[in-house]
């Protein structure tokens, strides 16, 4: 009787990502058990990148102008404006994620027990929960979320 030899582990199983999952989204489960469909953050998502670049340029120009002013006078009002612009950039980042990375969810309920339908507006609202946004952001950056070997799992869902 011949002993069946296991094939060696493939590097492709460990590192090859799916362009389909990166663009259209992969289903992930948060640490609290909620299911979201997220696309990958990066060059494969040109809408996200363009939105971030355009909004970022405008805010960056405002920040540079204020930094020059702050360096001259060190006005508390100008420092507050810089803080406001930093908060504005955070809001832009969160909105970009909600619009272009978060593709859907399943079985999310509001406080009254009503299912929350997927929409960009609802996504923007949900991403205001910074811990949820932070957890999904990390998953959207990880290559392992989008492995080709995950295609079967995503197809079943």
What positions do the PLM features span?
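Short, charged/polar N-terminal "headpieces" of proteins
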Residues: 1-70, 147-157
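Extended, compositionally biased low-complexity polar/Lys-Gly-rich tracts
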Residues: 35, 93-106
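Charge-dense, low-complexity intrinsically disordered segments
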Residues: 38, 42, 46, 88, ...
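Short acidic, glycine/tyrosine-flanked loop/strand segments centered on an H-E-D-like triad
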Residues: 61-78, 103, 107-116
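Intrinsically disordered, low-complexity acidic Ser/Thr-rich regulatory segments
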Residues: 76-96
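C-terminal charged interaction modules
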Residues: 100-157
């Amino acid at each position: 009787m011949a002993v069946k030899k296991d094939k060696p582990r493939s590097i492709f199983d460990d590192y090859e990502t799916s362009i389909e999952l990166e663009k259209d989204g992969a289903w992930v489960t948060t640490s609290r058990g909620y299911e979201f469909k997220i696309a990958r953050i990066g060059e494969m998502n040109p809408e996200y990148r363009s939105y971030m670049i355009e909004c970022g340029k405008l805010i960056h120009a405002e920040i540079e102008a204020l930094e020059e002013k702050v360096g001259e006078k060190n006005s508390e009002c100008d420092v507050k404006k810089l803080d406001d612009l930093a908060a504005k950039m955070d809001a832009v980042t969160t909105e970009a994620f909600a619009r272009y990375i978060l593709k859907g969810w399943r079985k999310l309920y509001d406080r009254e027990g009503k299912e929350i339908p997927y929409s960009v507006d609802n996504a923007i609202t949900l991403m205001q929960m910074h811990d949820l946004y932070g957890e999904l952001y990390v998953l959207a950056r990880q290559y392992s979320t989008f492995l080709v070997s995950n295609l079967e799992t995503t197809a079943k869902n």
